[in-house]
């Protein structure tokens, strides 16, 4: 990795520290919270009925997302990389996304699950802004790492925000998820999220496959485990749409590695 010439400023060091702190927080909150009396996120979320939540094992996707985020934070904090365009252009957005993740985990674990949708959409907005910023930077190794790890976060949280919003909205309005209206809301939001991700994937010069991978993972695990035909059809249609967006991007991409970061 080649650093950007020029000495690091106080702003560079502050940004790097913020990113490291936020990245550590998003990993530690789910571990420390239950030790301090909070309930695990999975336990709290199951109290809100849903027909569109992927199976528990699908959430293992957070492993590679967190690993990529940690690697990005460490690399951007190194003296030779604090001043890289990728660090300066996207660092604060990456820190905002990680902070949002930690906040979402804390609020959910404290039992206020219905307050979480706005936080999730904030994460999506921050990750989306970072993704857009990274499209404009030179494709250095540092930039590729950030683009890939953030792309996975963007793809997963875009779907998660739609599912979370549907579940909380139906619970707030006392609408049964498996009713006609409930299915319309849930499947409409999931389909809308898939369409939005498809558009992002098709338009991304770099990191398209990273974004597509986690959305497709969530949708395909949902489709493979649900007993509801309408949910299965919507999920597979979403996977097909995202795959179509990725194929459109592949046709325009000269370097295969650009698809990943």
What is each PLM-predicted segment?
Residues 1-261:
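Short amphipathic, positively biased membrane-proximal segments
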């Amino acid at each position: 990795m080649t650093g950007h010439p020029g000495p690091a400023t106080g702003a560079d060091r502050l940004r790097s520290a913020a990113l490291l702190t936020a990245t550590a927080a998003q990993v530690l909150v789910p571990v420390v919270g239950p030790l301090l009396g909070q309930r695990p996120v999975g336990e709290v979320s199951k109290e809100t009925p849903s027909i569109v939540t992927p199976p528990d094992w699908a959430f293992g996707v957070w492993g590679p997302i967190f690993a990529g985020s940690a690697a990005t934070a460490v690399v951007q904090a190194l003296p030779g990389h604090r001043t890289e365009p990728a660090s300066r252009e996207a660092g604060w957005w990456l820190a905002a996304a990680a902070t949002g993740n930690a906040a979402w985990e804390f609020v959910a674990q404290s039992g206020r699950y219905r307050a979480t949708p706005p936080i999730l959409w904030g994460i999506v907005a921050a990750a989306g802004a970072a993704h857009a910023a990274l499209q404009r930077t030179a494709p250095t190794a540092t930039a590729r790492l950030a683009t890939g790890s953030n792309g996975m976060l963007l793809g997963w949280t875009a779907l998660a925000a739609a599912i979370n919003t549907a579940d909380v909205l139906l619970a707030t309005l006392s609408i049964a998820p498996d009713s006609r209206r409930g299915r319309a809301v849930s499947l409409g939001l999931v389909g809308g999220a898939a369409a939005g991700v498809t558009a992002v994937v098709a338009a991304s010069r770099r990191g398209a496959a990273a974004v597509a991978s986690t959305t497709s993972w969530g949708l395909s695990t949902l489709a493979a485990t649900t007993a509801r035909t309408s949910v299965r059809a919507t999920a597979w249609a979403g996977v097909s749409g995202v795959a179509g967006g990725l194929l459109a991007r592949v046709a325009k991409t000269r370097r295969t590695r650009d698809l990943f970061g």
